[in-house]
Amino acid sequence: MGKGGGRDKYEPAAISEHGNKKKAKKERDMDELKKEVSMDDHKLSLDELQRKYGTDLSRGLTTARAAEILARDGPNALTPPPTTPEWVKFCRQLFGGFSMLLWIGAILCFLAYGIQAATEEEPQNDNLYLGVVLSAVVIITGCFSYYQEAKSSKIMESFKNMVPQQALVVRNGEKMSINAEEVVVGDLVEVKGGDRIPADLRIISANGCKVDNSSLTGESEPQTRSPDFTNENPLETRNIAFFSTNCVEGTARGIVVYTGDRTVMGRIATLASGLEGGQTPIAAEIEHFIHIITGVAVFLGVTFFILSLILEYTWLEAVIFLIGIIVANVPEGLLATVTVCLTLTAKRMARKNCLVKNLEAVETLGSTSTICSDKTGTLTQNRMTVAHMWFDNQIHEADTTENQSGVSFDKTSATWLSLSRIAGLCNRAVFQANQENIPILKRAVAGDASESALLKCIELCCGSVKEMRDRYPKIVEIPFNSTNKYQLSIHKNPNTSEPQHLLVMKGAPERILDRCSSILLNGKEQPLDEELKDAFQNAYLELGGLGERVLGFCHLFLPDEQFPEGFQFDTDDVNFPLENLCFVGLISMIDPPRAAVPDAVGKCRSAGIKVIMVTGDHPITAKAIAKGVGIISEGNETVEDIAARLNIPVSQVNPRDAKACVVHGSDLKDMTPEQLDDILRHHTEIVFARTSPQQKLIIVEGCQRQGAIVAVTGDGVNDSPALKKADIGVAMGIAGSDVSKQAADMILLDDNFASIVTGVEEGRLIFDNLKKSIAYTLTSNIPEITPFLIFIIANIPLPLGTVTILCIDLGTDMVPAISLAYEQAESDIMKRQPRNPQTDKLVNERLISMAYGQIGMIQALGGFFTYFVILAENGFLPIHLLGLRVDWDDRWVNDVEDSYGQQWTYEQRKIVEFTCHTAFFVSIVVVQWADLVICKTRRNSVFQQGMKNKILIFGLFEETALAAFLSYCPGMGVALRMYPLKPTWWFCAFPYSLLIFVYDEVRKLIIRRRPGGWVEKETYY
């Protein structure tokens, strides 16, 4: 990049340039993440390496030089991602989204009070109260949300490893253990099995060293490390060990080539933490909703402002009306309701092992339409398990279930006894100490994955392997290496009827078979003829085709005359036979699917969610697991399957004929975005195998280009860019790395894919329930606003006061609205397609038309009916009320006449008016009963859904009790200007309540009977 030579030309545009720079940097970072790692230290010879880093390959750096480098480069640690200061987080909760609307309302109230105080001698304090209450609501709910998020981030903090890592370095020719943060470039470092690699190392000597690279490359098998340069790609070559991967076995020495943020791991972490996650769908929905509500409020306010001027009110009165209408339109209680709904769901999910870091992420999961899932540990159990054996010329199935409830096989065969003996003896894995009381499958093992699988299998089937090894003491062994691909050991044989030395060997099946001349069948040795070789080949191909890792086993009794007791076996200059052995059988292993996964994948499919597997593993294994868990469903073929069935080359098959598709990482590398889009569009079932972490990011972007809302699961550092880019990143709590947990929005505490599906269901439920809650809350807006409008137009005494509106929004409506968050899912929740964020909004025109235009209008009628009844009982017939307002509200007029000629003083009139306010308020509570019950469902009948929601039933009683308390409690006349009512006045609104219930049940019945009809199109929100 240039050094900014053309800077002076653009001086005036500095501001926009800053924005563009930020954007350009974001795009640059994104491209950086998609690039493969570039470094050349693995290609250097040892001399060049020594010169480049100014170090000594045997004595290491001097202490003084190391101190200089540490001062220059800084500590060997990852820079923590930039955190948002707490006060900023708090302000976001106080002034973000919905809160802003309430703040504006509060300011308008204070403004109105100011105008009244300046112009009237005894101003009413309504607007002052209203402003104070609105401010209080925002502050309380803001604190509540802030507290919730702070709680989640506390749990996050606890994940961080508190133990400072140590590293063994050679300085001044002496070994010393130092804090890993003090390791510098050029240091000579020693690592052994069990250590975490402290920085990026170039290996200069190694002894049987293997590292677990799964968190970086996704390879589940431990990778050998040696001084040899074996691959151009630094991630694949054997002579580089990466920062924060673990050394599983063996020892190695290496020179530090990168530290801290400059390591491969550090680069990914830094770039990922810089990626911006977009706005969550629910935040966008709430913003959309605020626009609608504000639009309606301002439209009504301005309309009536103009109308009141036409009706010859003064300017000041018109402004007060304007503010009153805007404030009456703001659903004050809704902010608290939304926060509580999200919090409840987050708590519910925590109980089901999902930790939600960001409350809004809960809903995002519900609108997910594509899940890109890792294979190892998420879909599978993350432990190699013996799946099949082949002996006595047939395949036997082993039990791969997590609780050993599956199939078993014939364990009495003499061949099985020989096979299990070889698998137990020719095996370096051991159980760690003091685990006698732990179930065998759960025990910790020292050794590599395949050997642990064999150890556990033999321990389950044949009893203690340790006792077997004690009976057959090991004399010598040749460990497995990649050139001869076998492992061999010779043991003392306790059985007196057989020769006293037993040689056992295991390794790559074809290599083992080449060394055999006979085969064991039903305990008898037979010559290995072509027919049996074919049988072996078929079994090997069948097990390999299942994606299993197959090992061959053979043995040989060494004749006593050649190998008497005390014979000195030599493994360097081999003095015992390695040919003409006796083949015993095959054992194949796989990392089996978790028990709950196939069902979870099935649920995703019926919920219209596409599950894509993305793994670093081999295509055959990936495809086998995909078939095992139902990501590739039965009967669906890939291009290769079709080619094999029709016996034609793959190039002749039309890719559109194949529903399923397995894409190899190396093919993905050469694809254009258009080709990737084509695959994502035309195949319903996709597996990406042998992918690099960078490609995971490309796949996520591809899905998002299709308009999908993408959830990604991952546990490695390599997954963090994809986790950050996805609409919702899901990290693993047990196997996950710290970096991936920081990048994710949600953490699965049990690493189980099935928990994601629970999350999807909860996410959809929260969206449904928020809709219901909003529909319920908005409905009462109409009976709150119409009295005000009629008051302006028809000049009648005010039917409902500001204070009473607050009692509804923040009093009686609060608990019922929140209780809808506890409503159970309707029966079709996981059978629907995912919602389309473009068209299916949280608040749409249909919801507004139902709440405002239909149910709200019936409620307003109920309120007005009560109002007219009370005034008529007091002598003011409806016709007499028109135009009465001017005299009614004039405190100096004490002789207003009613329909019967009686005169009313100002005080008497006001008591009747406030009684009307109270009655109108009670009527709204009564019609809200029916509204609450109908809001329980959107499609099902309330009778189908039932009244199992105890909180909702409590809500009904609570709002009624509160209304009664406000009406009958002594002293309310002074405090809130609410007066006691005659019992009969409670019943005025009952018919309207019943009408609402019947009207809505009929509407839902028509929707169920005529799906897609006009009733559904016009009223189904």
Curated annotation (Swiss-Prot):
Q: Which residues carry this modification: N6-acetyllysine?
A: K9, K21
- Residues that, per the record, bind ATP: K485
Write down which residues bear the modification named Phosphotyrosine.
Answer: Y10, Y258, Y540
Q: Which residues carry this modification: N6-succinyllysine?
A: K659
Region described as Mediates interaction with SCN7A: 594-715
* Superkingdom as given in the UniProt entry: Eukaryota
* Segments passing through the bilayer: 86-106, 130-150, 287-306, 319-336, 771-790, 801-821, 842-864, 917-936, 950-968, 984-1004
- Matching InterPro entries: ATPase_P-typ_cation-transptr_C, ATPase_P-typ_cation-transptr_N, ATPase_P-typ_cyto_dom_N, ATPase_P-typ_P_site, ATPase_P-typ_TM_dom_sf, ATPase_P-typ_transduc_dom_A_sf, Cation_transp_ATPase_P-type, HAD-like_sf
Entry's localization field: Cell membrane; Basolateral cell membrane; Cell membrane, Sarcolemma; Cell projection, Axon
Residue spans of biased composition, Basic and acidic residues class: 1-11, 26-37
Please provide, in alphabetical order, the Gene Ontology terms of the cellular component aspect for this entry: axon; basolateral plasma membrane; melanosome; membrane; plasma membrane; sarcolemma; sodium:potassium-exchanging ATPase complex
Q: Which UniProt keywords apply?
A: Acetylation, ATP-binding, Cell membrane, Cell projection, Ion transport, Magnesium, Membrane, Metal-binding, Nucleotide-binding, Phosphoprotein, Potassium, Potassium transport, Sodium, Sodium transport, Sodium/potassium transport, Translocase, Transmembrane, Transmembrane helix, Transport
Q: Which topology term describes how it sits in the membrane?
A: Multi-pass membrane protein
Modified positions (Phosphoserine) in chain numbering: S16, S38, S45, S226, S450, S482, S666, S941
Has UniProt tagged this entry with the keyword Membrane? Answer: yes
One term of GO molecular function: metal ion binding
Its name, as the record gives it, is Sodium/potassium-transporting ATPase subunit alpha-1
Residues reported in the UniProt entry to bind Mg(2+)? D715, D719
Q: Lineage, please?
A: Eukaryota, Metazoa, Chordata, Craniata, Vertebrata
